[in-house]
Amino acid sequence: MKYNFDEIIERRGTNSYKWDLVKEDGVIPMWVADMDFQTASCIIEALQKRVAHGIFGYTLVPDSYYEAIISWFSRRHQWKIEKDWILYTSGVVPAISCCLKAICMPGEKVLVQTPVYNCFFSCITNSGCEVVENELKRVGNCTYEIDFEDFERKCADEKTTAFILCNPHNPAGRVWKKEELERMNDICLKHGVKVIADEIHCELIMPGYQYTPFASISEACRDNCVVLNSPSKSFNIAGLQIANIICPDATLRRRINRAININEVCDVNPFGVIALQTAYNEGEEWLDELNQYLYENYQAVKEFFNTELPQVRVTRLEGTYLVWLDILPFELSSDEAYEKLMNDGKVFVNSGTMYGRKAGQGYLRLNIACPRKTLMQGLIRIARVLSQYMDEEDLSGCPA
């Protein structure tokens, strides 16, 4: 590889949310979704050049910003975006809130597919709306599929006005197929439900799978959705706070733009603008190598648990760098496992119940976007703790 993802870079003492939230020494953080790799060197160099200028006043967003987005999605994903569709903002979570305020009235219902990214819940409730769950169906202990009967039943409720899609899905690891996306949109259209597609992990795809932008599938999908994306996950630049709302429908776009301004998330900083342009114009080679390294990390996780502790069932990872571990065979709840791993194992993972009290029970979320040495140290600690709570009758691991 041209880029060294094995390099261990000290992040403690940098006010890192991932590393400095827990003050106790020796804890390996494998939780929140940022990576322990330096971003692409081209981005670092572009930011250094901007810093050298020394003046950091209010910034305009140039045409080259939009051109970078349009070019990237055209050549990487065969999705033709028009400049007018793009609204910039400071992050995908603020974007979700703005979209909900533009689409829903307080008291209405918003559908999500649990287990799912925990901020969806707070965005919905903070908008005065009610969370409705379409729980994904576990298949063969190793992956998930959509319960379409339940999905339509929830959409048919006249109070359900929006559906937040997670594609790729965090934490279930699915990269939804075109046919699945089309079927969901058909149901949403039938019942007047708008789709808000969170596609922030769209560049983090495992070999053999393909991300399909929701709005690229058909005119019907395009006209019924808002797509949210950002280079923050794929290029590890979340702290630069840059994201985009892609909304082809002009009427809805005006409402969202109004919500962005009302909620004062309409300004972005020059570093985010420069980082996005550089990532999309020059970062492709780095991203491809990153995905290869993440795939090797995922293979290492599967091999480790299949060999050392097969009772831990590793959910198939199609996209993201977040591995969903099934610990149902153990005599621990998700929250108990989280506490034991933190206190006894000194490894920080996410309890599955963050992503749905019912759908996430018996699971842990593991961030594998770290150097392999760090990953293996974390896995050893996890196995050492969980092995004390085994149900000896359940030895069923996932197929390799």
Segments predicted by a language model, with ranges:
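A structural alpha-helix within SAM-dependent methyltransferase catalytic domains
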Residues: 48, 152-155, 185, 189, ...
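Conserved core segment of the aminotransferase class I/II
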Residues: 45, 219-295, 303, 384-386, ...
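PLP-dependent enzyme catalytic core of the Aspartate aminotransferase-like
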Residues: 331-333, 340-348, 355-400
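Conserved core of the PLP fold type I
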Residues: 56-186, 203-204, 211-216, 220, ...
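N-terminal small-domain helix-loop-helix segment of the aminotransferase-like
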Residues: 2-91, 98, 279-282, 388-389, ...
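Hydrophobic residues in well-ordered beta-strands that form the structural core
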Residues: 112, 133, 197, 349-351
